[in-house]
Amino acid sequence: MAELSLAELREIMRQSLGEDEVPDLADADTVTFEDLGLDSLAVLETVNHIERTYGVKLPEEELAEIRTPHSMLIFVNERLRAAV
């Protein structure tokens, strides 16, 4: 079973930001995507990358409630476990 790690999410977010710097996710459970400089388009690019890489569909209506990298990680991994 594939699982998305915090390091993998961090790299995907870096690619979505289009920057060389990797976002600091030391406080991944409290820092928001907005705090990290990810606008809605960058978050959507992150989601699309995860869907392509992990072969899982992430419902947009549920994603709208996710504000932090930690919640994204939990959400994605729950979907990955359910897909098995």
Swiss-Prot record:
Positions of modified residues (O-(pantetheine 4'-phosphoryl)serine): 40
Molecular function, one GO term: phosphopantetheine binding
Keywords noted in UniProt: Antibiotic biosynthesis, Phosphopantetheine, Phosphoprotein
Residue ranges of every copy of the Carrier domain listed in the record: 3-80
Pathway membership: Antibiotic biosynthesis; daunorubicin biosynthesis; Antibiotic biosynthesis; carminomycin biosynthesis; Antibiotic biosynthesis; rhodomycin biosynthesis; Antibiotic biosynthesis; aclacinomycin biosynthesis
GO BP annotation list: daunorubicin biosynthetic process
Function (record text): Involved in the biosynthesis of aklanonate which is an important precursor common to the formation of the clinically significant anthracyclines such as carminomycin, daunorubicin (daunomycin), rhodomycin, aclacinomycin T (aklavin) and aclacinomycin A (aclarubicin). These compounds are aromatic polyketide antibiotics that exhibit high cytotoxicity and are widely applied in the chemotherapy of a variety of cancers.
Protein name as annotated: Anthracycline acyl carrier protein DauA
Source species of the chain: Streptomyces sp. (strain C5)
Gene that this sequence comes from: dauA
